[in-house]
Amino acid sequence: MGAAMAMFRKRLMREPSAYPNQRITFLDQYMLRELAKDYKHFSGGRKCFKFRDFFAEHFIGTAPIESATHKKWYIDVDHLYACLFINGDHWVALDIDLPMKRINIYDSIPHLTTKPEMARQCMFLREMIPAMMSAMVPEEIRKKSNARLEVKRIKKKVPLNKDPGDCAIYTIKYIECLALGTSFDGLCVENMKAIRIKLAAELYDEVRETARPYELDMCREEIRIPQLEDSP
């Protein structure tokens, strides 16, 4: 998943960019995991909590170095796209809409997670992202507010994973389509084999040399990319 998000960031940096809306970014998977880890300390004492420089680098778009966008959240970015791993066995796509103060969730198997549980799984983002903006965005640009982000599950015209096992692919394709401003037409079980092969080829071609090892491991484990080597 990390490799896919790195690929999308690299595409965002191209001139011309394929993305019609340039006020977007794709969150790094390692940063999300670190944010979730720090949530315990954050929720235990917000007044004493200070975000690490690591998070500031991601906030201003200078990290990850190999796919830095140099876009600052809220100032240059309205939408943060993210892949969230929930319940230890399922991926969902997030469109974190900063101006609307809302996390839009795209879930290929929605019956697996109740609405309250999904809200709980997103809690570290709902609380820490507003706090990051309050700490890192000048008050003349954004009035300080630590109010939780709302959560909304998007269901209309969202294709479902009727053959469970491809939630990671659906998640990546949701994010790609949202960023491109296109519909989800063609994202279905009948096309899944072709989608897998195309995605594997794109990842191999665009990020194999710059993606960090854990990103490739995540991708290999969750997406099960087919081998591309020539047969003996």
Task: Specify the residue positions occupied by each region the protein language model found.
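Enzymes acting in ubiquitin/UBL processing and closely related pathways
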Residues: 1-232
